[in-house]
A protein has these predicted regions:
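Hydrophobic secondary-structure segments that place a key small or acidic residue at a functional site
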Residues: 133-235
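Transmembrane alpha-helical interface segments in multi-pass membrane proteins
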Residues: 343-389, 418, 422, 426
């Protein structure tokens, strides 16, 4: 059959040259569009390491003025007074939420971009017995607020329990790190517990003397994903002693009980947001944790995650638009090319060829053209990358990436395979539908039409 395929391709070389050139261009463009999307989707679908599917973020806003602006007052007394009032009201909101039947735990968020799966805060930690440091995502949480229970972050065997880590009686001098970070620094997760860690920062005593800030590793937890756009399981959790006072807004993260429908919970609570209020604050929205960066600005700066998601969605929409048009063009070209072969189909039917054999022959010719064009595209793209005109989509993660994304040969093969399958499916559609129509035509009618 291969001999017949090559013979047919050569006999129609004038048309096939244009088909081949079109396929090379389409494969090349598809490669550039699919690569970043495939990488981002891969990272987004990596295990979160905590109960992300049961988390909801509640956004609380100031609806009645709470005192005067703190910047209009000198000294710390007024700020302390307002902070205490703010803390009381946040605890009232937390209690309102805990009274809901669907809610298991509630904790506070100080900054939306500093938490698992949406982290943008990094701190360089010096490595023991080394001159270099590593950049680690940091998360600041409020002690005595059920942080680890709410997120469902699990301690490793031998580490203090979730409740003990959330209480963290040692305050800001204690640190909780993930298993992979502990193994990177100390070689073993279990060996990290109780060790001291130099933060790389110093503090002064007011006389010009500087002292290093030393943390004690209070506990080690299982790996959690710090971000959704790169491989990142290193993470450090640093306790704060109190809520950060904000004059206009606050956020609480809610962990639902097992079996609760999150979509229904969000819809139901959205209709009764005005009922969940303290003296000056009211909860005005509920958003699934995974969607929080897209729907809320951060406390102190524009939400980088929201911008990242916007850019990604824009690139996906652009890629889909171009790929659909390119694929429709390929389908149309092969469709017309196949319909022109009605006479050839009639002759083969007259000589005893079956419908299945004719369709298989046409399809095999398309597969050969697609395979050759993909092979040429791979050579062109390798040179495209080698010359510096383009590059593989490999995020510059602070942590070594063990996945296929950072393995350049494997990365290239996987993306090439995805592109090849998409183009193969497109070509198959452009051949199978018209070929099915022409093989059902009787040989006499097929020859009469020609």
């Amino acid at each position: 059959m291969m001999k017949q395929i090559w013979k047919n391709l050569w006999s129609q070389r004038a048309q096939n040259v244009w088909l081949f050139a079109e396929l090379v261009v389409v494969c090349f463009v598809a490669w550039t569009q699919i690569d970043p999307i495939a990488v981002r989707l891969f990272y987004q679908n990596q295990p979160a390491g905590f109960d992300i599917d049961r988390l909801v973020v509640a956004d609380a806003r100031l609806y009645k003025t709470m005192g005067q602006n703190i910047y209009d007052h000198d000294g710390d007394e007024y700020y302390q007074q307002m902070s205490e009032q703010f803390t009381r009201e946040m605890k009232q909101l937390k209690q309102h939420l805990l009274e809901l039947d669907e809610v298991a735990y509630v904790s506070f968020l100080d900054a939306i971009e500093g938490y698992p799966r949406m982290n943008k805060s990094y701190w360089e930690i010096p490595l023991p017995n080394d001159t270099i440091g590593i950049d680690v995502p940091w998360c600041f949480y409020n002690i005595e607020e059920d942080f680890f229970e709410t997120f469902g972050i699990q301690p490793i065997p031998g580490s203090p329990s979730q409740h003990e880590l959330s209480m963290n009686s040692g305050g800001g001098q204690n640190l909780i790190i993930t298993r992979s970070l502990a193994e990177r620094i100390y070689g073993s997760a279990e060996a990290a517990i109780g060790k001291n860690l130099d933060s790389g920062s110093t503090y002064g005593d007011g006389t010009g003397n500087k002292y290093p800030i030393i943390y004690t590793i209070r506990g080690v937890v299982e790996d959690v994903g710090a971000r959704t756009d790169e491989y990142s399981t290193w993470m450090a959790f640093c306790p704060n002693g109190h809520l950060s006072y904000n004059q206009s807004k606050a956020r609480l993260v809610i962990r639902l009980k097992p079996g609760v429908n999150m979509t229904r919970f969000v819809e139901e609570q959205t209709y009764r947001t005005g009922e969940l209020a303290s003296e000056h604050f009211v909860i005005c929205s509920f958003v699934p944790y995974v969607d929080a960066p897209k729907n809320m600005d951060s406390f102190d700066s524009p939400d980088f995650n929201a911008q990242s998601d916007y850019d990604f969605n824009l690139s996906v929409a652009t890629a889909i638009f171009f790929l659909i048009n390119l694929c429709l063009g390929v389908i149309g070209t092969f469709w017309m090319q196949t319909k022109r072969r009605t006479e050839e189909s009639g002759i083969m039917r007259a000589f005893g060829a079956t419908k299945r054999r004719i369709m298989g022959l046409f399809l095999a010719e398309g597969f050969v053209l697609t395979t050759l064009s993909m092979f040429i595209t791979c050579i062109l793209y390798l040179n495209y990358v080698k010359t510096g005109l383009g590059k593989l989509c490999i995020p510059s993660s602070t942590q070594p990436d063990p996945t296929w994304v950072a393995d350049k040969p494997l990365h290239f093969l996987i993306i090439s395979g995805i592109v090849y399958l998409i183009i193969l499916l497109t070509v198959s559609i452009g051949i199978l539908i018209p070929s099915w129509n022409i093989v059902r035509t009787k040989p006499v009618e097929a020859l009469r039409e020609e």
